[in-house]
């Protein structure tokens, strides 16, 4: 109730990558709590090519990124926002935050990330622009002296503990993006399962064939 009263009629500029429809769920929840949300994908496009370039060599499309954020400034110039809410901050440029701060001095800048800074270092360079900063990574919270906020779950899972138990098909299940040491660690666990009569299933998500080929050739953890 307190949160609903606080967000009632507040205008929020929400920037987030598109990830398994979570950005839509967040937007809908904020609106359910009474906020008026203007959403933009953090990336200039959501195709696998752009995702791959951002991860491998962002400078190749930096001009396009800057133009995209200049357009956001123009499109939102007539709206007086109460909050800027950036989720993840993978490519949000510093000039955008500086210009928005000048144009909207009463707007509070809030940052949250559900990714570790070891996977995406760019957000570290823009943290200084935010009034409130949160991360799901407890190590990053300590290292960078920012607020720790554990990863959330959707309302649809609130009552999952009360549902009827299902027979498990697998003893070990991994679903996630293949980055850092995840593939190496999960492969070790799969081998352990095979040697001890346990069942396992792993599904690795990657941002397109370009990223996969790069990892396969240059990243030893994928050998």
Regions found by a protein language model. Give the residues of each.
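Nucleotide-sugar donor-binding catalytic core of glycosyltransferases
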Residues: 2-56, 67-71, 88, 94, ...
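Short, flexible loop segments at the rims of nucleotide/cofactor-binding pockets, characterized by
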Residues: 59-65, 86-89, 110-116, 220
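Short hydrophobic patches on amphipathic alpha-helices
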Residues: 76-77, 101
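Proline-aspartate-enriched helix->loop->beta-strand connector
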Residues: 80-82
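Short alpha-helix within the catalytic core of nucleotide-sugar-dependent glycosyltransferases
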Residues: 97
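Active-site proximal beta-strand in glycosyltransferases
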Residues: 100-116, 134
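Conserved nucleotide-sugar donor-interacting segment of glycosyltransferase catalytic cores
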Residues: 116-117, 123-124
């Amino acid at each position: 109730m307190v949160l609903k009263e606080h967000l009632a009629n507040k205008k929020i500029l929400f920037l987030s990558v598109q990830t398994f429809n979570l950005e839509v769920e967040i937007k809908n929840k904020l609106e359910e709590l009474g906020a008026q949300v203007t959403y933009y994908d953090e990336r200039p496009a959501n195709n696998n090519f752009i995702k791959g370039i951002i991860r491998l060599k962002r400078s190749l499309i930096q001009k396009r990124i800057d133009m995209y954020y200049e357009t956001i400034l123009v499109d939102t110039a007539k709206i007086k926002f109460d909050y800027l809410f950036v989720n993840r901050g993978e490519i949000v440029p510093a000039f955008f935050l500086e210009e928005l701060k000048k144009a909207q001095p009463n707007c509070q800048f809030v940052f949250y990330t559900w990714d570790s800074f070891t996977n995406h270092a760019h957000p570290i360079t823009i943290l200084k622009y935010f009034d409130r900063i949160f991360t799901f990574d407890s190590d990053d919270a300590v290292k960078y002296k920012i607020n720790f906020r554990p990863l959330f779950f959707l309302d649809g899972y609130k009552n999952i503990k009360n549902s009827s138990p299902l027979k498990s098909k697998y003893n070990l299940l991994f679903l996630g993006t293949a980055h850092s040491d995840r593939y190496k660690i999960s492969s070790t666990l799969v081998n352990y399962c095979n040697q001890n009569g346990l069942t396992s299933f792993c599904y690795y998500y990657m941002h397109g064939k370009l990223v996969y080929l790069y990892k396969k050739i240059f990243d030893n953890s994928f050998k």
